[in-house]
Amino acid sequence: MVYTKNDQKSINFLKVFDFWSFFVILKKMKGEITMKKVELNKKKKQDALLNTAYQLFTEKGFQKTSISDIVNEAGVAKGTFYLYFKDKLDIRYKLIAKKSAEVFKHAYQELQKQSIDHFEDQLIFIVDQVIGALNANPTLLKLISKHLSWGMFKNSLVEPIDDAQRNIYDIYMDLLNNSGHEFDHPEVMIYMIIEMVAGSCYNVILTGEPVSVDELKPYLYQSIRLIIQNHIL
């Protein structure tokens, strides 16, 4: 095939254009990779601070742990701490939210493996999984139980815990909507359940008083069922 001068110019232009397009795409990909590395590095530092705070809060206690203790143990500069947290109370708040989300995530994953159709049974299964996790880790219980309130449940546990990017509150509302029932003040209902579970299990798990966890469960779960039934319209 014979090319004219104009054909050759067009071919040369396309070669330059293709090379430039490839260069632009490559540069964009490099920028995206760099951004991902930056985000991963930021998350790594934040996780290091959270994990260190958890270790120190549970070993030394919240009051005896300083921000300097946390950053020194985590191996980051003090200024880095303030990039992620306002103060010591803020890191505890976020730490409780993170640990609580992990517990609920595991409970919900276990629920998905079961064939449980009724809302009451689904909620009690989740509660049972949460109690089991806290019973197996009293240190974690000490950190989150006294702070696992309705406000924490609704406003702080925003980290997605399933493939649909739903958080704990979203999942609770979906379970309600799929229950086949309408509920009177569902937020009041879950508030009462959370407060009852947190309050009644704390001393039972830590001291075994007035009964063991296994002895408490039937009474606790019956109370949960009654709360749910009283809210069905």
Regions found by a protein language model. Give the residues of each.
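Short hydrophobic/aromatic patch on the recognition helix
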Residues: 75-85
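Basic, helix-initiating cap at the start of DNA-binding domains
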Residues: 1-60, 65-76, 90
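Hydrophobic alpha-helical connector segments
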Residues: 94, 98, 108-136, 193
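Amphipathic alpha-helical packing segments from all-alpha helical-bundle domains
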Residues: 105, 153-180, 187-191, 218
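Short secondary-structure transition hinges
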Residues: 132-170, 206
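Alpha-helical DNA-contacting segments of helix-turn-helix folds
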Residues: 92-102, 106, 144, 164
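Hydrophobic/aromatic-rich alpha-helical bundle segments in the mid-to-C-terminal region
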Residues: 177-223
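Flexible coil/turn residues that form the inter-helical turn or adjacent wing/linker of helix-turn-helix
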Residues: 63-64, 84, 209
